[in-house]
Amino acid sequence: MLHKLLIVVFLVVCLHDMRLNGQKKKETLLSEKVSQMMEWVSKRAVVRLNGEKFKRLVRAHPRNYSVIVMFTALQPQRQCGVCRQADEEYQILANSWRYSSAFTNRIFFAMVDFDEGSDVFQMLNMNSAPTFINFPAKGKPKRADTYELQVRGFAAEQLARWVADRTDVHIRVIRPPNYAGPLMLGLLLAFIGSLAYLRRNNLEFLFNKNVWAFSALCFVLIMTSGQMWNHIRGPPYAHKNPNTGQVSYIHGSSQAQFVAETHIVLLFNAAVTIGMVLLHEAATSGLDIVKRKIMCVAGIGLVVLFFSWLLSVFRAKYHGYPYSFLFG
């Protein structure tokens, strides 16, 4: 009986020691991973990962830190202009966190380039870039851990809000100073001042209703085309399918848009406006009948053609919209 009791005690002690050794080994491994990440971050805010580093530092356990990973294709032969723009915003976000007083090892920013880690793209069944995914400290990434690039855009401020939602880490985005805006404003004011000085004896153009009407019309066209949304969200200019190479200029969702789409809508609205002006002039001007007929036909053509295209764009974004004109 005593012999059996000693065997049981011996087994319990051995299992306890094995558990302690396993725990110590786990803690040592975790400490090494965190130290490695901190060392890399001290040199560069965004850690570049290949397949082996991604598996060891992001996928493998133990891990008590979250990793935001941007999957991209920055090599020139990939011809991904959006990737370069997204990378600039991502670098701004990562540097804002790196040099923040609240910086900790709770979260790291990393990047996997297709040409350096194509096996990672295959592992995750990923066929588009850029893509942002949050790998949480515990558990696997959920659907909300994949950033909705087409909806939110890739502005650093939008990425920071998403990071705060997924990790509860709030980052104040600090952009490097950009002197282009103040410089352009200064040049514009100098131009206006010079023009006013040169024509100081004849300032009737400031009271010309056509000048103010044209200026107001340009402002309305710019605002109704979605330029302010672009300024806030920072969407890509267009989207190129990496598999087919086809470029999309119109976003298929009513919740987002491309910059090119804004230019297209602005052009269509401007053409419809010109058509309406021609129709008005054809009916009220004192020109001869032939010129008025030409203006009338041109105005009708512009309104019908471009309003039809405008409706087709609307139908492409709002699926199920029942109305169309010339184009289905």
Swiss-Prot record:
Domain Thioredoxin: 40-168
Transmembrane segments: 178-198, 203-223, 258-278, 294-314
InterPro entries: OligosaccharylTrfase_OST3/OST6 (IPR021149), Thioredoxin-like_sf (IPR036249)
Record's GO cellular component terms: oligosaccharyltransferase complex; plasma membrane
Signal peptide interval: 1-22
Subcellular locations according to the entry: Cell membrane; Endoplasmic reticulum; Endoplasmic reticulum membrane
Coiled-coil positions: none
Keywords per UniProt: Cell membrane, Disulfide bond, Endoplasmic reticulum, Glycoprotein, Magnesium, Membrane, Signal, Transmembrane, Transmembrane helix, Transport
Cytoplasmic side: 199-202, 279-293
SUPFAM superfamilies, per database record: Thioredoxin-like
One of the Pfam families matching this protein, by short name: OST3_OST6
Main location: membrane
Glycosylated position list: N64
Disruption phenotype: Early developmental arrest.
GO biological process: magnesium ion transport; protein N-linked glycosylation via asparagine
Origin superkingdom: Eukaryota
Ranges per topology, Extracellular: 23-177, 224-257, 315-328
Biochemical pathway: Protein modification; protein glycosylation
Membrane topology recorded in Swiss-Prot or TrEMBL: Multi-pass membrane protein
Cystine bridges: C80-C83
Summary of the function given for this chain in its UniProt record: Accessory component of the STT3B-containing form of the N-oligosaccharyl transferase (OST) complex which catalyzes the transfer of a high mannose oligosaccharide from a lipid-linked oligosaccharide donor to an asparagine residue within an Asn-X-Ser/Thr consensus motif in nascent polypeptide chains. Involved in N-glycosylation of STT3B-dependent substrates. Specifically required for the glycosylation of a subset of acceptor sites that are near cysteine residues; in this function seems to act redundantly with TUSC3.
Family per record: Belongs to the OST3/OST6 family.
Quaternary structure and partners: Accessory component of the STT3B-containing form of the oligosaccharyltransferase (OST) complex.
Protein name: Dolichyl-diphosphooligosaccharide--protein glycosyltransferase subunit MAGT1
